[in-house]
């Protein structure tokens, strides 16, 4: 079974990412000479916020320590109570003893039994340290000496106890693990490396154990506390890209194009990927949902722009309330800006704030620079819903569908296509909006103009006079570079064909009356 396929978990699937921490880890390990560890126990705290890379840092340490240490990975958050924490910890220590270390194995087991018995009967804790429970039994201190003697003989590798996600624990369990580090398992030649969120630990100790000076308490536990070094912002983008490429099975060309589009969102206005995805865990979580949604929309429609989709999904992930508003009540945030060469209704964001979400909204919903691509952008009413449904909504006619009809060579194909759409239930509004807002390839292609008028003449029976005016008004058909005589010839032929049918003559006449306009003198 290939665990690299499918969704991404917090664990690192391959070698730990090169993020500039290896040298730092080497310097840290240099502070731990073995001759010093033979004399004392050492506890190192790795402090960082949720998702900041603590697990990756621990893995980097483990990789460098595997050869020279007896590495133990202890997950206390899998235990249900403090007795299980103690039992599981010492069981892991015993597993790291050699087969010929039977006396050490036995001493660890006895030590564990006394510790557990002392926890059940607290009154005997002190006596257990100095007095045997029977003539044949050893004291806690004597067993500790025996264990330390066995694990510090010449050539013995130190124990390296790795504890990740200490901040998963609640009050009693957390306190028990800290006591384990500081007192119960405070053996010479043992190194504890513990990852945690300091703020969380302090709050839990304060609330559950009434430890008011929790920071000082933590300082007594850990001899050295490391705050993770800063890494380059691009590192998180690389994590996101690697996981997205893996989950979505993108090829090299697709991956390069996706990264280029992501970077286009963040090359101006001071926007950064880390404004939306601030840490490693979030980068992987975003990759999971983005890859899923990207595969879904790619499978169902071509009527979207990938760069816009990335922006909408970033809002979805980092600002879910804003995304919810865009999905269900868009006009709270946006306004409809009618006009422009395409006559399309563009959704525009006019907020002036400089938060990351405001900057991204302005990049997605702007009012200028209309192109042939505009009808597929999120700011276009024609395609807006696609970005939230991950498909073409029911009864909608896709931009690509309409475009293919506008560039068809055969007029019968155009007429048949429009009539198929007209027979679709509840498709009138979608078809009307396509006619009203179509960009017309800049009015420079005679075939596109011909097909548009041909299709409109088929659709005209369903239109009111006002609808005809809204579609045709402010369209300027004649421009430089167009063969006017050829255009006139083809359009006259289309009108003659429709008139010959003898139906809807008044509407055709209304269309003709609105049709011929030259560019106004001040048009640029």
Residue ranges of model-derived segments:
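The feature marks long, low-complexity, polar/acidic/proline-rich intrinsically disordered regions embedded
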Residues: 1-40, 44, 52, 58-72, ...
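Short glycine-rich substrate-engagement loop in P-loop NTPases that contacts/grips substrate
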Residues: 82-86, 127-148
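A short beta-strand-to-loop transition that corresponds to the Sensor-1 phosphate-sensing loop
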Residues: 195-199, 204-208
């Amino acid at each position: 079974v290939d665990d690299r396929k499918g969704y991404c978990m917090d664990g690192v699937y391959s070698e730990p990412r090169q993020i500039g921490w290896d040298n730092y880890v080497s310097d840290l390990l240099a502070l731990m000479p073995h001759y010093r560890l033979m004399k004392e126990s050492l506890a190192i705290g790795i402090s960082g916020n949720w998702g900041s890379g603590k697990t990756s840092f621990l893995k980097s340490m483990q990789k460098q320590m595997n050869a020279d240490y007896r590495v133990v990975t202890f997950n206390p958050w899998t235990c249900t109570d403090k007795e299980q924490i103690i039992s599981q910890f010492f069981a892991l220590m015993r597993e790291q003893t050699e087969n010929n270390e039977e006396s050490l194995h036995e001493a660890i087991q006895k030590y564990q039994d006394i510790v557990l018995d002392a926890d059940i009967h607290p009154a005997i804790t002190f006596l257990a340290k100095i007095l045997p429970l029977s003539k044949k039994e050893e004291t806690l201190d004597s067993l500790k000496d025996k264990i330390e003697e066995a694990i510090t003989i010449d050539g013995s590798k130190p124990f390296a106890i790795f504890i990740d996600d200490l901040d998963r624990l609640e009050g009693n369990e957390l306190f028990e693990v800290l006591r384990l580090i500081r007192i119960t398992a405070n053996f010479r030649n043992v190194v504890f490396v513990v990852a945690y969120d300091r703020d969380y630990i302090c709050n839990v100790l304060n609330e559950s154990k009434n430890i008011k000076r929790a920071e000082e308490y933590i300082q007594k536990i850990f001899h050295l506390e490391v705050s993770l070094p800063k890494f380059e912002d691009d590192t998180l983008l690389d994590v996101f890209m690697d996981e997205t490429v893996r989950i979505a099975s993108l090829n090299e060309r697709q991956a390069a194009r996706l990264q280029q589009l992501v970077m286009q969102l963040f090359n101006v206005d001071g926007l950064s990927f880390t404004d939306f995805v601030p840490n490693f865990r979030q980068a992987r979580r975003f990759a999971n949902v983005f890859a899923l949604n990207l595969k879904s929309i790619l499978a169902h429609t071509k009527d979207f722009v990938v760069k816009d989709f990335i922006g909408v999904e970033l809002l979805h992930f980092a600002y879910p309330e804003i995304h919810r508003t865009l999905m269900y009540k868009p006009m709270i945030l946006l306004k409809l800006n009618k006009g422009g060469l395409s006559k399309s209704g563009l959704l525009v964001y006019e907020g002036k704030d400089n938060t990351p979400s405001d900057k991204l909204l302005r990049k997605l919903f702007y009012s200028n620079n209309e192109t042939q691509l505009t009808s597929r952008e999120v700011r276009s009413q024609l395609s807006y819903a696609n970005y939230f449904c991950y498909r073409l909504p029911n009864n909608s006619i896709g931009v690509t569908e309409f475009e293919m009809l506008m560039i068809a060579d055969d007029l019968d194909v155009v007429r048949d296509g429009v009539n198929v759409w007209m027979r679709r239930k509840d498709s009138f509004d979608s078809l009307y909006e396509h006619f009203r807002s179509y960009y017309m390839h800049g009015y420079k292609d005679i075939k596109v103009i011909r097909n548009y008028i041909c299709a409109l003449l088929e659709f005209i029976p369903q239109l009111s006079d006002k609808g005809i005016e809204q579609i045709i008004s402010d369209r300027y058909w004649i421009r430089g570079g167009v063969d006017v005589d050829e255009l006139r010839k083809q359009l006259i032929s289309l009108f003659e064909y429709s008139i010959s049918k003898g139906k809807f003559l008044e509407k055709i006449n209304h269309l003709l009356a609105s049709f011929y306009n030259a560019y106004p003198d001040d048009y640029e």
